[in-house]
Amino acid sequence: MSNRKYFGTDGIRGRVGDAPITPEFVLKLGWAAGKVLARHGSRKIIIGKDTRISGYMLESALEAGLSAAGLSASFTGPMPTPAVAYLTRTFRAEAGIVISASHNPFYDNGIKFFSIDGTKLPDEVEEAIEAEMEKELTCVDSSELGKASRIVDAAGRYIEFCKGTFPNELSLSHLKIVVDCANGATYHIAPNVFRELGAKVIAIGCEPDGLNINEEVGATDVRALQARVLAEKADLGIAFDGDGDRVIMVDHEGNKVDGDQILYIIAREGLRQGQLRGGAVGTLMSNMGLELALKQLGIPFARAKVGDRYVLEKLQEKGWRIGAENSGHVILLDKTTTGDGIVASLQVVAAMVRNHMNLHDLCSGMKMFPQILVNVRFTAGKGDPLENENVKAVMAEVEAALGNRGRVLLRKSGTEPLIRVMVEGEEEAQVTEFAHRIADAVKAA
């Protein structure tokens, strides 16, 4: 990934109005992508977006660029990222494009691509698009220009797909669920999925205004969800992020249930049902408690680099079907091709109904180790903090103190100028002190 100029671990992302997220760049990106994708056959592209106000501007720019390259665009309107992957597959489009910055604030946005089979674009295609960006934009002949259309039943198609991943013999009629859509792309999808399966749904974070996506709601801030679950005496709460590829849950006591715990529940249920193929994939950030709990069940566990594309690569390498990040990206390859918050949450709720257990009890077989994450902003060009000798020395001291009862991880964010410092161990006070000691060394580097 290091030789890329524009593409990061999750497409192209940045602040709207600053390079590269400008109308001029996105128009050129649409054209370059069109030139590359036109070589492959079909000339139709699916374009979806989340609820950010900048989505209107950027989809227009993308459509202009694609049209200039001779490709037609079909718009879904606000639609979860996994829905665009699904629709790309079912419409047999050449590619799908999502305009979203996922869990980031409204003033950020991004562009990510899906291939014809609903997976992230291969590295070589992204590199070919970057190479095309360096060329001068030329427009095809007027008779060859692409057209624009709208997919009017996109939401209904995806709702039916999601419901189809929930077992027919089960019903949610006895459950009260608070659903938090982060004022994002799932706002008109997720509440309907759970209602149509019989649940009593209380919806929050379902009033997008273009500016309030992920603002004190959704998977990255579950405080409003926790409060509402307790106030409503609900059975559980489910929070999605702005583009619906992440899910975090809340049990009836208001406790947060993260991606590691969701992976544990789904893996254990797969084992019970005789449907688990191989093991489960987590990441370098996955809690040690997950690894130990799966080991006790005899379920193999492997760690991938952080990023859902790396979880997917590890699953494909191992021939396994389920993987997740603790942030709530859950990939279930027997159901879909990419992280899907709604589909993942349905599998957890199915386990609750089938086993007549609440979410709190489903998690009880896994003891979470205290894990402290500190984000340190750094300035590009000042040198690599991860190569600093003092940082290395402090990290070595902490690792020696933890021994085999904990872990230390330092890594750069794939989407922001941040160093993420993670320390995990048995004692929360000790882990917190160690994390801040390393973070201070990174700041001073």
Curated annotation (Swiss-Prot):
Keywords: Isomerase, Magnesium, Metal-binding, Phosphoprotein. Disulfide bonds: none annotated. Mg(2+) binds at residues 102, 241, 243, 245. PROSITE patterns: PGM_PMM. GO terms for cellular component: cytosol. Its cofactor is Mg(2+). InterPro entries: A-D-PHexomutase_a/b/a-I, A-D-PHexomutase_a/b/a-I/II/III, A-D-PHexomutase_a/b/a-II, A-D-PHexomutase_a/b/a-III, A-D-PHexomutase_C, A-D-PHexomutase_C_sf, A-D-PHexomutase_CS, Alpha-D-phosphohexomutase_SF. Binds 1 Mg(2+) ion per subunit. Its EC number is 5.4.2.10. It catalyses: alpha-D-glucosamine 1-phosphate = D-glucosamine 6-phosphate. Belongs to the phosphohexose mutase family. This is Phosphoglucosamine mutase. It comes from Enterobacter sp. (strain 638).
